[in-house]
Design a protein with these regions (language model features):
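Long, contiguous internal "core" modules enriched in hydrophobic/ aromatic residues
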Residues: 135-139, 143-149, 157-160, 193, ...
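Short, highly charged, low-complexity non-transmembrane loops/tails of multi-pass membrane proteins
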Residues: 102, 301-306, 357-363
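Ferredoxin-type iron-sulfur electron-transfer modules and their immediate structural context
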Residues: 1-26, 30-36, 40-42, 46
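Juxtamembrane/interface segments at transmembrane-helix termini
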Residues: 178-181, 287-297, 351-360
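Membrane helical hairpin/interfacial module
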Residues: 159-205, 209
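Flanking helices and flexible, charged tails adjoining ferredoxin-like Fe-S electron-transfer domains
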Residues: 4, 32, 40-141
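N-terminal signal-anchor module of multipass membrane proteins
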Residues: 110-111, 115-158, 164, 168, ...
Length: 363
């Protein structure tokens, strides 16, 4: 896949992709890759793949060296039935139709690949719809999201020292996610087009503001500034996943989910009455479980997500609910333990956000 509007290139925070103007090939620059794996989420066709051995993503470059030398790519030359062909395409027509009745919406990235094949029936659910498989939990990303949002909540509650501690822990989690952590500095290079770069910049601004608020007497201006950058962190985090096109990761839902996480954190840390914290937690729980209403739908991404949450991932859902209930029960008597349990429950919930995501894939 070498798209007219490649999502891998647009999402990459490290500027590790480039698109050749002559051939249209989307080329991955191994030396620039930091191994965040975000392009594996933004690409709906699962073309970039993460190499555990190398700590970076690898991708077909359409044998760019062969093309520039006037030769066909290796796959074209090797195919014994001549089932693959490279040809000049009309960029304006890219993504309008690609010959597949199923699979991701081509309008997302305008792929220039065209399939000539017998169309599968579209009036029946596929095997993937009936028996979806859980995805990767991305524990470091889950930690980054939860800890950063709890840090924002702690800052809003007037607890800058706790906010600083949580923000530093979130930053460590973000680096732990990288395949090449020594190149973490490259994560800000794509700020013009990558929401991941913008999240890094927002969190980098929030952390010192939280530190300054913790160390100075006149905290109000710093708290306001920390609150503004904290809101930017939450917004950027939601946009990172919303742009992947997954229906369960739509922007309104993620803003509600991430924002309610920060709200529950603020209420819990501020020591407000248990009824207030519980009401906010239940509202957040409604956002988490809203997808369950699609459990009886025959096919589709949200139907698969509902089946995963009620089936293979039901034990994790149970643990998440148990930690929430116990955390609320002990919050008033032992605030530190209650907060720790609530954070633990949110970590499970955020892992489910990744594991239960079941986007449309290639048939």
């Amino acid at each position: 896949h070498h798209c007219a509007d490649p999502a891998c290139l647009a999402g990459c925070p490290a500027e590790a992709y480039e698109k050749d103007a002559l051939t249209g090939a989307v080329i991955h620059l191994d030396d620039a890759c930091i191994g965040c794996g975000y392009c594996t989420m933004t690409c709906p066709y699962e073309v970039p793949s993460f190499s555990d051995r190398l700590g970076i993503v690898r991708k077909c470059d359409l044998c760019h060296g062969r093309l520039t030398a006037g030769e066909a790519p290796a796959c074209v030359q090797a195919c014994p039935t001549e089932a693959i062909r490279i040809q000049v395409v009309d960029i304006d027509a890219a993504g309008t139709s690609w010959g597949l009745a199923a699979g991701p919406d081509p309008a997302l990235t305008r792929p220039t690949t065209t399939y000539t094949t017998t169309r599968p029936p579209v009036d029946r659910p596929s095997a993937a719809d009936l028996r979806p498989q859980p995805g990767h939990g991305h524990p470091a990303l889950a930690g980054l999201l939860v800890l950063s949002q709890w840090a924002v909540g702690a800052a809003a509650a007037g607890r800058p020292a706790l906010a600083l501690t949580l923000a530093l822990a979130a930053s460590l989690a973000s680096v732990a996610h990288l395949g090449r952590p020594l190149l973490a500095w490259r994560a800000v290079l794509g700020w013009r087009h990558s929401w991941l770069s913008r999240e890094v910049l927002a969190l980098s601004a929030f952390t010192p503001l939280a530190a300054a608020a913790a160390l100075t007497a006149d905290r109000l201006p710093l708290r306001v500034a920390a609150g503004a950058t904290g809101a930017a962190v939450v917004g950027c985090s939601a946009a990172i996943y919303a742009v992947t096109g997954r229906r369960w990761w739509r922007l309104p839902r993620l803003l509600a989910l991430f924002g309610s996480t920060a709200a529950v954190a603020a209420l819990a840390v501020a020591g407000l009455p248990l009824a207030v914290v519980a009401a906010a937690a239940l509202a957040k729980l409604a956002v988490e479980g809203g997808v369950i209403r699609h459990r009886s739908t025959a096919r589709g991404e949200r139907a698969r997500t509902a089946r995963l949450l009620l089936g293979p991932l039901s034990a994790q859902v149970g643990r998440r609910l148990a930690l929430l209930a116990i955390g609320l029960a002990v919050l008033a008597a032992v605030p530190a333990a209650g907060i720790a349990l609530l954070i633990g429950g949110d970590l499970i919930e955020r892992g489910l956000l990744f594991r239960a995501a079941s986007p449309d894939k290639m048939p």
